[in-house]
Amino acid sequence: MTLTVAVDAMGGDVGVGVTVPAAVDFLDRHPDVRLILVGQPDAIEDELTRLARPRSGRLTVHAASQVVAMDDSPQSALKNKKDSSMRVAINLVKEGQAQAAVSAGNTGALMATARFVLKTIPGIDRPAIAKLLPTMKGESCVLDLGANVDCTPEQLLQFGIMGATLIEGVTGRNNPTVGLLNIGSEEIKGNDTVKQAAELLRNSSLNFYGNVEGNDIYLGTVDVIVTDGFTGNVALKTSEGLAHMVGALLKQEFGRNLFTRLSALAALPVLKHFKKRLDSPALQWRQSGRPARHRGQEPRRHRQPRFWLCHRRGRRRSPRQRNRTHPGTGQPPAGCAGAR
């Protein structure tokens, strides 16, 4: 069965400079997927021409005249940018022309737009940003990672339900364990919201492990870790910074002299395997222990997220992305201008 995905081609810090090459690469590896690139046709076509590669019949362009900027408020995006690439991509899902949408755009605007257009399932107040993070034991689902800065105990319970459902569908684990991120494992720790959420989780049908601490995220203590969006986002960005530092330090040490360069060459297979283990498994849908991309199967519909949020500074995986300005805003990549 062919899966159709609508891609917000203008989203992210670079826009079409990343999304279009990545889309072309993706189609080369996934013959059972169709992509709809949503955005400004001229910018998309110019990028396709620059790539100078045969155009797949599974790639189409859908026009959208507006772009949601990274500093647009969710309210402004909803009210004033109804023809944005983000909004149109999500509309295609609602209309049944696509089964899912992908965007690397403004997080707040994306969550607000998706909630407004697609709604939430009964019993769920707010959507949450979830991610599968690598751990010592495989991967764990962590949510919320930034969609909801302030949460009620009831919403944290809902996040637990969503996370457990997601990781069951992705990994095939039955009765996954759910932990509540806290400053200590003892029941007396945490603020009132966390304590009340723990009580709700404990009395639910979920396999509630109890409170977990920050170090448990990567130890793989539980299958699902629940937290509010503020704490989750700080934890995620801290992890990204640490990973960047470790990578940079390794590069410096291996490049110190001829002997260390030769050592790096000898260690290359180990380093590649190490990097592979750390790569996010979030898009590797698993069924029967194997990634769905190898099986040509679509995730079960009732457990399938309808849209994906990508990192705003995400880059194409193959050749390095050149310095470019965003075609919709004319601005260089935020936070990494001049970087190669």
UniProtKB/Swiss-Prot annotation:
Residues 300-325 have a biased composition (Basic residues). The keyword Membrane does not apply. It is found in: Cytoplasm. InterPro entries: FA_synthesis, Phospholipid_synth_PlsX-like. Keywords: Cytoplasm, Lipid biosynthesis, Lipid metabolism, Phospholipid biosynthesis, Phospholipid metabolism, Transferase. Coiled coil: none annotated. Its EC number is 2.3.1.274. The keyword tRNA processing does not apply. Residues 285-340 are annotated as: Disordered. It catalyses: a fatty acyl-[ACP] + phosphate = an acyl phosphate + holo-[ACP]. One of its GO terms (cellular component) is cytoplasm. One of its GO terms (biological process) is fatty acid biosynthetic process. One of its GO terms (molecular function) is phosphate:acyl-[acyl carrier protein] acyltransferase activity. Homodimer. Probably interacts with PlsY. Belongs to the PlsX family. This is Phosphate acyltransferase. It comes from Laribacter hongkongensis (strain HLHK9). The lineage of its organism: Bacteria, Pseudomonadati, Pseudomonadota, Betaproteobacteria, Neisseriales.
